[in-house]
Amino acid sequence: KIPDSIISISSGYVIVVDKQHQKIYVFHKNSSFSKVFEAACSTGKNPGSKQVAGDAKTPNGIFFVTRILTNPGPTDVYGSMAFPLDYPTISDKRAGRDGNNIWIHGTTKTLLPTQSKGCVVLHDNDLKRLAQYIYFNKTPVIISESLKWISQDKISPVKNELERILTSWHKAFVEKDIKAI
């Protein structure tokens, strides 16, 4: 089974964070999906999606890693490297959400669930393994409160329905048909 949030990925790697279960996964898509990485993680101390700076929430959404920071600070807190995400995105800003410095980073401390200030934290050894799957501004990072798992044989019908909805929405948008949107 795979998370339903990745069915539109055409190829390559996708990183998925499940805040409810405090897990991070990497899936690879060729002709089908395969899980290539799984580890425990820690997300924000407070539940829900990030709204404002300092709320100790991890944002939900689709993000991209923008760069790597080596030796970003004390290794017990940040590990040996950090991968900043592009939060807040344009849609976050339009929705009035702010904040900054949302990273995927390591730690050498004991990893406890929901203990970050909003980042996605892994044990440093797991972060080093995760790093091989990260391509800057290319590998999507999907952060979700919880994942809905579907079997791969259900992908085509769900994907077709999503494409139908998006096509319909796009047509209504282009034609300025507000009622249809």
Where are the model-predicted features located?
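Cell wall/extracellular polymer interaction/catalysis modules
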Residues: 1-101, 155-156
